[in-house]
A protein has these predicted regions:
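The short coil/loop that forms the "turn" connecting the two helices of the helix-turn-helix
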Residues: 15, 26-30, 59
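Residues that mark the N-terminal boundary/hinge immediately upstream of a DNA-recognition element
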Residues: 5, 16, 46-49, 60
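Conserved hydrophobic/aromatic packing and binding residues within compact polymer-binding modules
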Residues: 6, 17-21, 32-38, 64
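Interfacial/linker helices and their anchor residues that mediate assembly or domain coupling
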Residues: 69-89
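Short basic helix-loop element that most often maps to the first helix and adjoining turn
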Residues: 4-25, 81-86
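Short, basic-rich loop-to-helix N-cap that marks the start of a DNA-contacting helix
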Residues: 14, 32, 40-55, 71
Length: 89
């Protein structure tokens, strides 16, 4: 689940794997390979890295961990709505 959502969020953000990795603090030489391994669920990032990735992609960490796709979408919509609401205040 995390891999699929990571790839979707990255593509929606218009970033290449290497760009996302570098912005999240990964070494430039291995950034693309590491993000690829996370997207393909060969390896799993630790929570600290997921938090950094979430900041770069502007999605909540919970989006990556929701068991059901429907719940993940609700989490994402809530995040967007909350962000818009705060901008209006």
């Amino acid at each position: 689940m995390l891999g699929k959502r990571l790839k979707i969020a990255r593509i929606n953000a218009g970033l290449k794997q290497a760009e996302l990795g570098v912005r999240a603090g990964l070494d430039e030489e291995s950034a693309s390979a590491r993000i690829s391994s996370y997207e393909n669920e060969v390896h799993a990032p630790d929570f600290r890295l997921v938090r950094k990735i979430a900041v770069v992609l502007d999605v909540p960490e919970a989006y990556f961990y929701a068991v059901e796709d429907g719940l993940a979408e609700v989490i994402l919509q809530y995040h967007r709505h909350r962000k818009m609401y705060r901008a209006v205040e």
